[in-house]
Amino acid sequence: MPDTAPTAARARLADARLYLCTDARRSQGDLPEFLDAVLAGGVDIVQLRDKGMEAAEELEHLAVFADACARHGKLLAVNDRADVAHAARADVLHLGQGDLPVPAARAILGDDVLIGRSTHAESEAAAAAAQEGVDYFCTGPCWPTPTKPGRHAPGLDLVRRTAALGTDRPWFAIGGIDLGNLDEVLEAGARRVVVVRAITAAEDPGAAAAEFARRLRQAPAHG
């Protein structure tokens, strides 16, 4: 695990506002430089999400992520696989609705790794807000996104309903969020967001991350 004790990792999660999902930048060939730029810019949590990658290759790339997160004091997340999260000594495991059940993931990882859930309906958000062993959850998609082709986007109404739960558990809005619609997401009640293309495809990813971070930090603290 990048140099964070469990208590420190949970404190960082509580303070987190900007969560980035990115592939391994194989086509660009700039992964170390990209990670340094976005983490310095204000990304709090970074997740490697590169579907179809074999575990051995994923671990190789995660070593680069872990090094960058350790240097910048940020959280490293692994998508879907508890075994890979354990081997990579990640701070965070993120689980979708169809992935390994949380108790099974906890049996593999123990209590030291943070676990997040994806939610796509108010009932799922309410369950994640209350479920033992869950540390945070994501709610959306706010808008249709090519990252999840064919998935219905419940929209900002789900963000409003999630905000109305009044949970103290950290939660992030996700799905098609960019700098052009961020204010709508904030007005709906979110105070944390997951971003993909608005940073990964930006001309200057570090500057894009910094602008997201600035606007999120300036938003009122409720939500």
From Swiss-Prot:
Presence of keyword Magnesium: yes
Class in the EC hierarchy, top level: transferase
Binding-site residues for 2-[(2R,5Z)-2-carboxy-4-methylthiazol-5(2H)-ylidene]ethyl phosphate, renumbered to this chain: 145-147, 176
Keywords of this entry: Magnesium, Metal-binding, Thiamine biosynthesis, Transferase
InterPro entries with a match to the protein in the record: Aldolase_TIM (IPR013785), ThiamineP_synth_sf (IPR036206), ThiamineP_synth_TenI (IPR022998), TMP_synthase (IPR034291)
Function: Condenses 4-methyl-5-(beta-hydroxyethyl)thiazole monophosphate (THZ-P) and 2-methyl-4-amino-5-hydroxymethyl pyrimidine pyrophosphate (HMP-PP) to form thiamine monophosphate (TMP).
Protein name as catalogued: Thiamine-phosphate synthase
Primary gene name: thiE
